[in-house]
């Protein structure tokens, strides 16, 4: 029951936000109520550094898709256009946005939704960045604006429902009954304090030392407890 909900969380929350905004601003509210509504809605869609807010990403991506298909910004001609001015003014007035939205809603999950429609234009318009934790201060800092890295980082957060891939490398490490785990590093470092707390709990269950092989700050690292 819960698996389909987890696989479409961004799509579900974005869809609800899209229609809630549409109904409230075009039908339900008086003009003097719009500002209060916008202030409340902005709190729901706020997104801090390194965060993935499903409401924000979902609704903005739906709006992006709607605009693209309304203006005919798809297909070989669009993909092959490299003239910036032509791309900015491109409008075939096709009006296919709503039709495309319902098609996307019917056919996609979060991973395919972002993989297909999270474009470089969308990334630039929404001012996305990649972030990395400064281990000295413990704060997230801007790492760059590479579209490929941004998209990969976002898709990685959706893989395995945002949890790291950990596997058993050796259940009798060094022939001493110790447990050796491996982390499938895909660009994002583990939180070292979380990893140590987890190993501490595993050690209580395993009753022998537990180690984890990972990569921190681009260097191989073995965490042991």
Where are these regions (language model features)?
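Active-site-adjacent "gating/activation" loops or surface patches in catalytic cores
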Residues: 1
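A charge-rich, low-complexity, intrinsically flexible signal that marks solvent-exposed coils, linkers
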Residues: 5-6, 10
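Secretory-pathway/luminal and periplasmic proteins that interact with or process carbohydrate-rich
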Residues: 4, 26, 44-48
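Short helix/loop segments within enzyme catalytic domains
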Residues: 23-37
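Non-catalytic terminal regions of proteins
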Residues: 36-225
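An active-site-proximal "capping" alpha-helix that borders the catalytic cofactor pocket
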Residues: 11-24
């Amino acid at each position: 029951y819960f698996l389909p909900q987890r696989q479409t969380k961004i799509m579900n929350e974005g869809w609800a936000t899209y229609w809630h905004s549409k109904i409230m601003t075009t039908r339900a509210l008086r003009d003097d109520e719009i500002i209060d509504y916008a202030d409340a809605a902005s709190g729901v869609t706020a997104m801090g550094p390194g965060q993935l807010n499903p409401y924000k990403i979902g609704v903005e991506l739906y709006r992006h898709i709607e605009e693209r298909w309304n203006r005919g910004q798809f297909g070989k001609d669009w993909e092959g256009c490299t003239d910036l001015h032509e791309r900015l003014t491109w409008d075939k007035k096709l009006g296919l946005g709503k039709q495309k939205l319902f098609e996307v809603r019917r056919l996609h999950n979060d991973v395919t939704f972002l993989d297909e429609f999270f474009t470089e234009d969308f990334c630039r318009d929404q001012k996305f960045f990649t972030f990395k934790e400064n281990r000295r201060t413990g704060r997230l800092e801007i790492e760059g604006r590479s579209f490929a890295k941004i998209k990969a980082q976002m898709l990685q957060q959706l893989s395995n429902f945002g949890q790291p891939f950990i596997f058993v490398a050796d259940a009798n490490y060094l022939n001493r009954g110790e447990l050796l785990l491996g982390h499938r590093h895909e660009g994002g470092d583990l939180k070292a304090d979380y990893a140590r707390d987890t190993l501490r709990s595993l050690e209580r269950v395993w009753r022998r030392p537990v180690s984890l092989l990972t990569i921190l700050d681009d260097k191989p690292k073995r965490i042991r407890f």
